[in-house]
Amino acid sequence: MTEGTTTRPERLRTDEAGRPLGAAAVVIGGGLAGVTAALELAGAGLQVTLLEGRPRLGGLAFSFRRGGMSVDNGQHVYLRCCTAYQWFLDRVGARHLAPLQDRLDVPVLDVGHPSGRPRLGRLRRAALPVPLHLAASLATYPHLSLAERAKVGRAALALGALDPEDPALDGVDFATWLHRHGQSARTVEALWDLVGVATLNATADRASLGLAAKVFKTGLLSAPGAADIGWAHVPLGELHDTRARAALDGAGVRTALRTRATAITRSADGGWHVDAESGPGTAERLDAGTVVLAVPQREARALLPDGALDDPDRLLDIGTAPILNLHVVYDRKVLRQPFFAALGSPVQWVFDRTESSGLAGADGAAQYLAVSQSAAQDDIDRPVAELRERYLPELERLLPAARGAGVKDFFVTRERTATFAPTPGVGRLRPQAATGVPGLYLAGAWTATGWPATMEGAVRSGVQAAGAALSGLGRPYRDPLAGGGGMTRRADQACAPRTGRA
């Protein structure tokens, strides 16, 4: 690209009679939301250009090389109820690389009792209908008293009666609701926060009841297998970058990496100019009828043209929450399970990433563990040396086999703005996909998907943005997330755009 170059992707492909097969679209942002929107728009016949400022796709779910290992910036999992993310994996040909458990089984180690020795409990399901599928596991869960377990059952039934889309739930914090329903501080720690912190990136006192109800009702109470856990058995970059890029290429999308959008302005014919830079002294102007803005909320605010939202500064009121990941390479095997969750320790979740990182082939004796710390406000800025001093002894408490093992490597990855903060009241701040100006749409896990900031929410936002865009063009739309495979219908019947306040 050179200074002053103008690209006009609106010159459409035509059929034999010379009729245009599509219209031009620019998608800004190459995370899961942007990739999804680009694939859907291209699949509907639009000529799509995808702009991404980084040298890779995948947003905050990516991999990098360290020595002989492929390292994920953070441990990402999904649940069987995450149908949109599974559709995405299918779309990029990667479902087999991120398999699900046959049946939910979460080992939970507690070192917070007087003996200090690790005590194992398990959260797992039986082959029974909801809610009996979890009853046996709850009845024998050793980290709660018998009375606490009984109260969990009653609270779960009450939670199942809530409507996550009820706006009244958005203004209440989850902890207050749990307290009203008889949940002790220990129960919150050993069960509700054990799951909620990992999925919401917030403790119960900082989480909207609406979003918490969405997580627990969908994951635990919608179907027996809804909470079965899946995760990538290869580096995330293989899924979200390599295979995503191949899918985009196959769909005819032009992908421009290391290219940052700098402005979105109206063109004289009612379309859009998107100005972009790919380095010092290089600039490009793309003309399109459709623009999807799939970047974090603060970046979106900076690019929004006048009239897009009634109060665009409300996007700045959507807070963020950090995630910290600690990476430890031992000189021998110290963990025999693929993962576990912890209680009575600052450690939250630990995953064995030896195989997926490639370390197993390079050093058969070593083991690489990834320690995932959500809602990490207290630790996110601690120096590496301090984190090492804090967490290595905790891993030895949880894993006796780690005592005396050599630590070959210890490093940290930090995502200070990993997700939007799911605080009470955030729902009224999250905008719909359609904006107040024709042809401009928003995507990202922070938009109004009804989900917390997850890979599922990101993919759903991309589908919503594409559906709204196709509605604006009056095009038929096959909703890939509709039940029964998705009935072909007009986009305005599937995803009607809404304007007004975000």
Regions found by a protein language model. Give the residues of each.
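N-terminal Rossmann-like FAD-binding beta1-loop-alpha1 element of flavoenzymes
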Residues: 20-50
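Mid-domain catalytic core of redox enzymes
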Residues: 2-4, 20-21, 104, 259-398, ...
